[in-house]
C-alpha cells in the first residue's frame, strides 16, 4: 500500500479516502452498538452480541447492499487499511488480556483448563473429519484435503477469547470461579489452535522454521526488557502516581514493532503479544499505569469496533443452497463438538452439573483467530473460493450470535446457580479461595489493611487461593461531579488532584505502601478506587462487594490512635457509613480498630512472633470470628490463642472441654447459648476447630470462668497487655457474661466486648470486630 494514501486524499472526484471512510464506519459501529446494547441489555445480552449486530447492519447484507453505501465503505485499497487497523486493535487487546489475566487462578486450575481444552479439541477434530466427508462432494473439492481439513479443524474448534472475556465481564462473572475458568479455557483453546496451526503450516511450507525460532527469541527478549524497564521507570519520577504518557508509549511501541515484524512473515502474532502481557511484572507503578491507561479505551472503543468488524464481514448474498447447507452443518458441528467435549471433561473433573450447559455454550463463540485463519493466503488452493470464504465467515458469525444468546438465556433462567454464595467464613473451606476487601480512606488505614492481609495470607506459596483487594475510599464533596469523562482526567489519569481530606496525595502513598509490601512478601493486592458522596458510600461498597464476590469486608474504625497513644475522632460521617455497611452488607463485615503504635504490626518484616487472641462467648458472630482465625493460625509469625468464656451458671452442665483432651489446667468455660440449637452449633464448631488446630499445637486454648459482666471486664483488663490483636464477634446476644457491660457502651456498632476493648485505656492492642452476614443486599433503606 502506498504510504502517501494513508494520510492524503486520493486524486480525482472522490471526497473520502479509505482511511476516512474507515473512521466513519467505526463511528457508525459505535453508535449502532450502543443502540443495540440499550435494547438487549434488559434481556441479559452481553456487549459483543450487540456489537456484532451493529456490524451486520452495516454489512453487505443490509446497508452496504445499497450501491452508494457499498461504494463509500468498500473502496479500492480498503482491505489494506482494514487489515492494518485490525492488527493494531488485535495487538492492543491481546496485550491487555495478558495483563489482566489471573495468573494465580490459572496456575491452580491448569489441569482443569488443559483437560477441557484437550477434550474439546479432540471431539471437534473427530467431528471435523466426519464433516470433511460431507464437504468434499458437496463443494467439489478434488485436491489438498489435508489443508482443507486443517482449516476446518482450527475454525470449528477455536474459541474467540476476546468475545469470552468481554462477555464474562459484562455478566459480572469475571470474579467468580466459573467465570475465570471459562476465560482460562478460552485462552488455552485459542492459543493452542494458533500454535498448532502455525507449526503445521511451517512444516508444510518448510520455509519459516528459522523465522519462528527468531520470533521466539524476539518475544523472550522483549519480556526481559520489560522486566528491566518496569521497575526502573517508576524510579525516575517517584512522586508521580502514574508513569507519563510518553513512558507508557515506549512499551506500546516495542509491542507494535514485535507484532509488525512477526505479521510481516504471515505468522500470527497473538501468542507473542499475549505472552508479553502475561509475563509483564505485576507489581508496581508500571503495571498499574498500563492497566489504567489501556482498560478504558480498549473496552469502550477498540473491542466494540473489532466485534463490529466481525459482523461487517457477514455476507451471504452470493451463496447458493448448498452453501447454506454448509453453514447449517458448520454451526451444528461446532456447537455439538463443544458440548460433547466440554461436558465429557466436566464429568471427568467433577465440575458441578449446574455449569455443564453454560461452559460449552460460551466456549462456542468465534470471531478472532478463526477469521485470521480464513483470511490467510490460500490463493494457490483451487478449492479456496470467495464463496467458501463467505460461507465460513457467515457460519462463524451465526455461531457466535447463537452461542451468545443461548449463554445469556442460561444465565437469565438459572440466575441462582451463578449467584454470589460465599458470604460468610463459617462454611468456607480453607482450601478454597479466600477473597477479602479492605477499605481505606488514607495511607494510615491502608497500612492497617495491609497488616491484616499479611496476617491472613499465612505462610503460603503463590499458588494458594488467597485474593486480597484494597478499596481506596474518596469522599466526594456534594457539589463536585461524581464522574469525570476520560478526557477530563489529569496526566495521572485520576481525579483533579488525587487528594482527599485525610492528607495530600493519599493515593500515591497508598500505592507506595502496597508496592513495598508486594516486593517484600510477593503477595499482590488488587486495588479498587471508589469516588462517591459520603451519604451513598455504603451502597457503593455493598454493590462492589457483590461484584467482587468477597467473603468479608474490613472497614476502618472512625477513630485513630495518635502518636501520644490517645484516640481522635475522624468524624460522625465515617461512623455512620460503617453502621450502614453493617446493616446492609451482603457478606461478613469486620471493623478494624488499628492501634498501629502499641498494637498489631504487619507480620511480614516484623522481627518477633505476635500474640493474637480470639474471644469466644458464643453465637454466630463469634463463630465467624473463630472461622476467620483459621487463616491466622496458618501464619508462623502469629501465635493464636482462643479464649473461651463460660458462665458459672452452666458449670454444672456437661462442658465442651470434656470432649477434648488438653494439658492446660486453666479454667475452661461453657458456651451459654440462647437456645439448645445455638449451643449445639457452637459446641460442634468449637470442637472441630479444637481438634484441627489446638491438638496439633498450632493454636493455644484457654477457658475463663466468669459470673457476670463486671467479672468479664476484670478478666479483659488482665489480658489487655498480653496480646497485640483481639478478634471478637460483634454480638453476644443476651449472654449473662456481658450483663451490665452495656452501661458504659460508646460505640454499639462494635458490640459490647469490642466497644470495651476499643475504648479501654487498659487495652493497648488492636481490635478486629467481626459480624457475620445477615442480610441480602436487595434494597437500601434511607438511613
Curated annotation (Swiss-Prot):
- Pfam families in the cross-refs: CHX17_2nd, CHX17_C, Na_H_Exchanger
| Subcellular compartments | Membrane
Which stretches are transmembrane?
19-39, 43-63, 81-101, 121-141, 145-165, 186-206, 208-228, 242-262, 300-320, 323-343, 355-375, 391-411
Tell me yes or no: is Transmembrane helix among this UniProt entry's keywords: yes
Give the GO cellular component terms, alphabetically: membrane
Q: Which GO terms describe its biological process?
A: potassium ion transport; proton transmembrane transport
Q: Which InterPro entries match?
A: Cation/H_exchanger_TM, CPA2_transporter, Na+/solute_symporter_sf
Task: Establish whether keyword Transmembrane is in the entry.
Answer: yes
* Alphabetized GO MF terms: antiporter activity
Top-level taxonomic group: Eukaryota
Q: What is its main location?
A: membrane
Tissue specificity is: Specifically expressed in pollen.
Q: What does the record say about its membrane topology?
A: Multi-pass membrane protein
Q: Which UniProt keywords apply?
A: Antiport, Ion transport, Membrane, Potassium, Potassium transport, Transmembrane, Transmembrane helix, Transport
Main role? Answer: May operate as a cation/H(+) antiporter.
Give the family per the record.
Answer: Belongs to the monovalent cation:proton antiporter 2 (CPA2) transporter (TC 2.A.37) family. CHX (TC 2.A.37.4) subfamily.
Q: State what protein this is by name.
A: Cation/H(+) antiporter 2
Say which species the protein is native to: Arabidopsis thaliana (Mouse-ear cress)
What gene does the UniProt entry assign to this protein?
Answer: CHX2
Amino acid at each position: 500500500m502506498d504510504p502517501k494514501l494513508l494520510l492524503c486524499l486520493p486524486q480525482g472526484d472522490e471526497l473520502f479516502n479509505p482511511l476516512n471512510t474507515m473512521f466513519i464506519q467505526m463511528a457508525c459501529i459505535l453508535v449502532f452498538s450502543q443502540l443495540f446494547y440499550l435494547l438487549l441489555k434488559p434481556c441479559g445480552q452481553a456487549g459483543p452480541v450487540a456489537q456484532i449486530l451493529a456490524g451486520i447492519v452495516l454489512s453487505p447484507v443490509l446497508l452496504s447492499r445499497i450501491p452508494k453505501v457499498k461504494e463509500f465503505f468498500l473502496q479500492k485499497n480498503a482491505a489494506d487499511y482494514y487489515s492494518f487497523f485490525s492488527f493494531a486493535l488485535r495487538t492492543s487487546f491481546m496485550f491487555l488480556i495478558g495483563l489482566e489475566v489471573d495468573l494465580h487462578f490459572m496456575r491452580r486450575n491448569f489441569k482443569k483448563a488443559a483437560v477441557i481444552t484437550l477434550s474439546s479439541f479432540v471431539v471437534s477434530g473427530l467431528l471435523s473429519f466426519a464433516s470433511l466427508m460431507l464437504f468434499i462432494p458437496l463443494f467439489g473439492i478434488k485436491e489438498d484435503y489435508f489443508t482443507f481439513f486443517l482449516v476446518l479443524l482450527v475454525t470449528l474448534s477455536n474459541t474467540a477469547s476476546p468475545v469470552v472475556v468481554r462477555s464474562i465481564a459484562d455478566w459480572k462473572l469475571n470474579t467468580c470461579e466459573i467465570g475465570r475458568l471459562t476465560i482460562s479455557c478460552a485462552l488455552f483453546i485459542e492459543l493452542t489452535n494458533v500454535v498448532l496451526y502455525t507449526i503445521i503450516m511451517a512444516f508444510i511450507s518448510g520455509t519459516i522454521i528459522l523465522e519462528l525460532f527468531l520470533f521466539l527469541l524476539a518475544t523472550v527478549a522483549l519480556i526481559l526488557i520489560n522486566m528491566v524497564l518496569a521497575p526502573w521507570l517508576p524510579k525516575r519520577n517517584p512522586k508521580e502516581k502514574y508513569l507519563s504518557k510518553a513512558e507508557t508509549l515506549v512499551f506500546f511501541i516495542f509491542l507494535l514493532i514485535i507484532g509488525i515484524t512477526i505479521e510481516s512473515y504471515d505468522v500470527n502474532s497473538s501468542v507473542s503479544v499475549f505472552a508479553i502481557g502475561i509475563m509483564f511484572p505485576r507489581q508496581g507503578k508500571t503495571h498499574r499505569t498500563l492497566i489504567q491507561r489501556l482498560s478504558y479505551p480498549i473496552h469502550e472503543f477498540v473491542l466494540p469496533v473489532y466485534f463490529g468488524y466481525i459482523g461487517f464481514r457477514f455476507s451471504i448474498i452470493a451463496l447458493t443452497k448448498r452453501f447454506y447447507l454448509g453453514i447449517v452443518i458448520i454451526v451444528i458441528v461446532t456447537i455439538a463438538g463443544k458440548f460433547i467435549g466440554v461436558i465429557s471433561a466436566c464429568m471427568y473433573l467433577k465440575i458441578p452439573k449446574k455449569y455443564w450447559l453454560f461452559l460449552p455454550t460460551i466456549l462456542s463463540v468465534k470471531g478472532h483467530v478463526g477469521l485470521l485463519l480464513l483470511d490467510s493466503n490460500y490463493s494457490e488452493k483451487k478449492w479456496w473460493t470467495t464463496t467458501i470464504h463467505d460461507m465460513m465467515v457467515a457460519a462463524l458469525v451465526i455461531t457466535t450470535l447463537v452461542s451468545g444468546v443461548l449463554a445469556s438465556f442460561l444465565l437469565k433462567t438459572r440466575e441462582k446457580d451463578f449467584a454470589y454464595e460465599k458470604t460468610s467464613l463459617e462454611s468456607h473451606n480453607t482450601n478454597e479461595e479466600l477473597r477479602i476487601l479492605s477499605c481505606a480512606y488514607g495511607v494510615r488505614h491502608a497500612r492497617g489493611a495491609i497488616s491484616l492481609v499479611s496476617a491472613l495470607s499465612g505462610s503460603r506459596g503463590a499458588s494458594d487461593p488467597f485474593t486480597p483487594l484494597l478499596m481506596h475510599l474518596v469522599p466526594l464533596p456534594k457539589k463536585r461531579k461524581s464522574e469525570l469523562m476520560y478526557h477530563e482526567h489529569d496526566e495521572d489519569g485520576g481525579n483533579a488532584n488525587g487528594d482527599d481530606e485525610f492528607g495530600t496525595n493519599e493515593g500515591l502513598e497508598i500505592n507506595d505502601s502496597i508496592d513495598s509490601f508486594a516486593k517484600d512478601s510477593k503477595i499482590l493486592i488488587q486495588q479498587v478506587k471508589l469516588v462517591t458522596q459520603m451519604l451513598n458510600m455504603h451502597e457503593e461498597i455493598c454493590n462492589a462487594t457483590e461484584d467482587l464476590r468477597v467473603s468479608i469486608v474490613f472497614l476502618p474504625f472512625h477513630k485513630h490512635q495518635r502518636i501520644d497513644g490517645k484516640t481522635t475522632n475522624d468524624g460522625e460521617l465515617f461512623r455512620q457509613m460503617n453502621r450502614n455497611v453493617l446493616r446492609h452488607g451482603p457478606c461478613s463485615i469486620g471493623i478494624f480498630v488499628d492501634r498501629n503504635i502499641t498494637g498489631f504490626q504487619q507480620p511480614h518484616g516484623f522481627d518477633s512472633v505476635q500474640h493474637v487472641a480470639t474471644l469466644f462467648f458464643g453465637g454466630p458472630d463469634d463463630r465467624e470470628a473463630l472461622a476467620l482465625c483459621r487463616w491466622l493460625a496458618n501464619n508462623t509469625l502469629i501465635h493464636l490463642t482462643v479464649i473461651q468464656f463460660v458462665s458459672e451458671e452452666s458449670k454444672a452442665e456437661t462442658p465442651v472441654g470434656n470432649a477434648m483432651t488438653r494439658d492446660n489446667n486453666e479454667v475452661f468455660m461453657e458456651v451459654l447459648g440462647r437456645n439448645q440449637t445455638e449451643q449445639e452449633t457452637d459446641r460442634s464448631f468449637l470442637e472441630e476447630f479444637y481438634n484441627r488446630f489446638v491438638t496439633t499445637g498450632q493454636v493455644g486454648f484457654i477457658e475463663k470462668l466468669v459470673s457476670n459482666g463486671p467479672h468479664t471486664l476484670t478478666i479483659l483488663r488482665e489480658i489487655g497487655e498480653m496480646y497485640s490483636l483481639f478478634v471478637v464477634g460483634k454480638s453476644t446476644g443476651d449472654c449473662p457474661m456481658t450483663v451490665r457491660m452495656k452501661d458504659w457502651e460508646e460505640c454499639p456498632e462494635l458490640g459490647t466486648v469490642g466497644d470495651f476493648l476499643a475504648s479501654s485505656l487498659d487495652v493497648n492492642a488492636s481490635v478486629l470486630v467481626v459480624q457475620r452476614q445477615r442480610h441480602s443486599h436487595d434494597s437500601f433503606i434511607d438511613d
